[in-house]
């Protein structure tokens, strides 16, 4: 699958006026979590709720990162999700859990996010 980038707004879950726009988020449905640059999360007051969470990178390297909670907005869609405090050298990613929470799917042919349709009730 070819990759593409999107823009999302990230907001503090307690004070939605504290927010920032991330302009180059790699859409990565192979990554479970969304990775947001630490300085951006710190600037809007997102707390580090889970510390030293272990992750295995695509190359097999094992690392730890902190995780917090944020509102993620794309167009008219929004969700509350766990976000990883990405460090220098980490990619900024919009991951599968956020895509599911936003009820969006990847249109790889057109390289864009589209509404996933009605939610399953059962």
Task: Describe each model-derived feature in a short phrase.
Residues 1-122:
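Pepsin/retropepsin-fold aspartyl endopeptidases
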